[in-house]
Amino acid sequence: MVLKDDNSEKSIELFISIGLDEKTARNTINNNKVTANLTAVIHEAAVTDGCDRNTGNLLYSVATKFPTNALVHRPTLLKYIVNSKIKTPAQLEAAFAFFASTGPEDFKLNEFEEACGVGIEVSPEDIEKAVKGIFEENKKTILEQRYRTNVGELFGHVRKSLPWADPKIVKKLIDEKMYELLGEKTAADNEKPTKKKEKKEKPAKVEEKKAVVETTAEPSEEELNPYTIFPQPEQNFMVHTEVFFSDGSILRCSNTKEVLDKHLKVTGGKVYTRFPPEPNGYLHIGHAKAMFVDFGLAKERGGCCYLRYDDTNPEAEKEEYINHIEEIVKWMGWEPFKITYTSDYFQELYDLAVELIRRGHAYVDHQTADEIKEYREKKMNSPWRDRPIEESLKLFDEMRRGIIEEGKATLRMKQDMQSDNFNMYDLIAYRIKFAPHPKAGDKWCIYPSYDYAHCTVDSLENITHSLCTLEFETRRASYYWLLHSLSLYMPYVWEYSRLNVTNTVMSKRKLNYIVTNKYVDGWDDPRLLTLSGLRRRGVTSTAINAFVRGIGITRSDGSMIHVSRLEHHIREELNKTAPRTMVVLNPLKVVITNLESDKLIELDAKRWPDAQNDDPSAFYKVPFSRVVYIDQSDFRMKDSKDYYGLAPGKSVLLRYAFPIKCTNVVFADDNETVREIHAEYDPEKKSKPKGVLHWVAESSPGEEPIKVEVRLFEKLFNSENPAELNDAWLTDINPNSKMVISGAYAVSTLKDAAVGDRFQFERLGYYAVDKDSEPGKLVFNRTVTLRDSYGKGGK
């Protein structure tokens, strides 16, 4: 902490030395990016011993505004500033505009100087003449408006005729001219102007309504197409990042024209992305967002997206996960251009590691994991860091041949152990693991790290857009450092916010724990937000993709998306695609006393609410018999004004059937539990009750309806963000997150339902047939409740 304070004070002293006031200097160090940029600019300009205030202000502007696509030209601009060839803000803004359009390409100095007014001296006499002319042109207006005159407009007129004039002199002469023409300010000049309110005629109401419709804002281009934020492949020439080294030097990483041209020739200018999951678990809804970004961008641009398995850890990968990932990607509606594995490139990666050593950018290290951690905390170099290149080459070959024991050596990248970015602390490139690889077999006993393989394979596959979540943003420096060190093509990297949804966990470690320890019923437990769990629950890939698209591709990190937002998209989709049917969860017997026991009335029930009468496929048959069943929650002994269920002496309408009126209640032996209800039906439908109930009837006397099992799911965790509970997160699991109802009754048409079929159980919600179903025993999972459970326990 003391070290940080010391560095801060040194930065403040440095910034004050170029003319910044202390307050500005202290505010600046609160912004790490500006601090790093300004420090670099001061060193590049060679003014670490200080400079005049005007120069310092220009340098500050360079640090905060210089175009990132032309950082290779920043030293040139700084020379012009330090040598007083560019000395006004107007010249500097012109320089920024020039370099923004030039980018990293070479330019002619004479064109640059002409664009920035280098060498043009505007005398005070020239400025005075211009100011005088502007005042003569606008004298009448100035006399009318006096000191309310828009001085900015006058200033702009002068700058238009003399763009390189010193703004301070221009302002001074305008002020003098105003005083000369108007004299001292009067009391009236200091009064705020009063605006006359114009009477506006009220348009007719019909016109008002029309106007609202006509002025409705159209969705932005980004809302219609979230991929507009990404550049085209041919634009990949800008400086991707600046790597600030502890010695004050700066590495600016960008593709050369030759490298970019070669890349574009291979790709044909197409967009190439990749979806790179590690096959060590099942994919969850966060991966759905990654797929939407990676596959979606490629599809929108007519490009290609790899499905690349990041299989660098032989001990974590399983064939089960590999098969699951490929299958679930296709279920989500995405078609990989090609399926690859990082292990496909093990030989190329090894050869590049050898080249990295030869170039002096990697070394074989013998520190233990604890020693590496300690040295990183102290920002100390490994004692083996500066060993001879030939020695590292020999040892790395011995690592490959299995001569060195596991844990006794690693290959580390020679980056910067004193950097402010911990991702530059000589990251491990290779480690020894005597474990067979699921795909590569026993050919290798050294395996590349994520930090080494990820960016390298991106380059080898000519990825144009390497897209990942924000926690990888600090890895940009090491990503581009490695590609630059190997002279490889550099993809465009962009980070977006991780998808966090309430009342669940999406950490693979935590998911693996609750699956392994039987807190849930496997990776596809419907309570999990794994994609297989959502699918088993009855959620469609269309709904998931709509949810992800609705969130957008943002960089605002840390926000939790409420699970109700996902449920909204699920309902929207199932409302359009799930046929209606009737199931009674907790059956209560109703005997229709005025219907003969052997009489059966066949009725039409709607599969779709907007079904046309002439479309027979939109209807299904339901029997109405002497014995029907309603839900226990739809009956009360005591009626109330806001209750629309059944009660003694009260009528309700059985959906698609007839009104019935409760005439008697039969109790069980305890004289409290209602065993059955007696009712009369109204075959003429003369009564018009408000309450409408779903129901299921016996299809023949004494034959009970189809019995099904229904599983009701609630949120798996009680807290919106169980991660905040740290080690106590398991105590937050909702013990009532799963309820099994084994004796529900269903209409007979459901007997042929297949696994995965989805339905709306009227008045209850959306349900899907579970894989645990067997012949004669259907199991349904509740996907999501209805938006409005009308008539349930109230209105």
UniProtKB/Swiss-Prot annotation:
It is found in: Cytoplasm, Cytosol. GO terms for biological process: glutaminyl-tRNA aminoacylation; post-embryonic development; reproductive structure development. It is an enzyme of class 6 (ligase). Keywords: Aminoacyl-tRNA synthetase, ATP-binding, Cytoplasm, Ligase, Nucleotide-binding, Protein biosynthesis. The keyword Transcription does not apply. Disruption phenotype: Lethal. In heterozygous plants, aborted ovules. L-glutamine binds at D310, Y450. It catalyses: tRNA(Gln) + L-glutamine + ATP = L-glutaminyl-tRNA(Gln) + AMP + diphosphate. The keyword Cytoplasm applies. A motif ('HIGH' region) lies at residues 277-287. GO terms for molecular function: ATP binding; glutamine-tRNA ligase activity. Belongs to the class-I aminoacyl-tRNA synthetase family. This is Glutamine--tRNA ligase, cytoplasmic. It comes from Arabidopsis thaliana.
